[in-house]
């Protein structure tokens, strides 16, 4: 089930990790491991290659969501996220990124709506690519990240 292309998705949920068996059960693949649980619990298969990512569309909580597992390496995750956000016209505030966090104990969760990448290269890549899209498409718009 794929929603109508442009504007058919309201949210992006991005599960960060590194592709390949070598990284399968490493800390950096916390996002991919979480995606596996979501697949099982929601009965979806994140397996359609699109935007340099494995993707699936789902309706969660009445919202149309694109689930993504970028197939770029962690440091280049923005190369998958930005084109999807642009294609579906999803604003940055509707992008949820699931990643590892070295400052949290396993099993702990933190949700942030503001802040920096905190040294996480995958988040840095996503922020940089999204800012690049904003500056290209809306050169007069000012973006502040605090």
Give, region by region, the residue ranges found by the protein language model.
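Single conserved hydrophobic/aromatic residue that forms the stacking wall/gate
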Residues: 134-146
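Conserved TIR/SEFIR loop-to-helix hotspot centered on a Trp-containing motif
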Residues: 117
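Nucleotide and nucleotide-moiety/phosphate-recognizing core
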Residues: 2-114, 123-124, 128, 134
């Amino acid at each position: 089930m794929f929603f109508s292309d442009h504007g058919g998705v309201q949210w992006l949920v991005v599960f960060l990790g590194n592709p390949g068996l070598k990284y399968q059960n490493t800390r950096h693949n916390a996002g991919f491991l979480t995606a596996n649980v979501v697949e099982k619990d929601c009965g979806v298969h994140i397996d359609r290659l699109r935007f340099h990512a494995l993707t699936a569309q789902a309706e969660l909580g009445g919202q149309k969501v694109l689930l993504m597992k970028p197939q770029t390496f962690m440091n280049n995750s923005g190369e998958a996220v930005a084109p999807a956000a642009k294609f579906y016209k999803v604003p940055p505030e509707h992008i949820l990124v699931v990643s590892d966090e070295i400052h949290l104990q396993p099993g702990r969760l933190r949700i942030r709506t503001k802040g920096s990448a905190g040294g996480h290269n995958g988040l840095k890549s996503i922020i940089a690519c999204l800012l690049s899209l904003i500056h290209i498409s809306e050169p007069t718009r000012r973006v502040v990240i605090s």
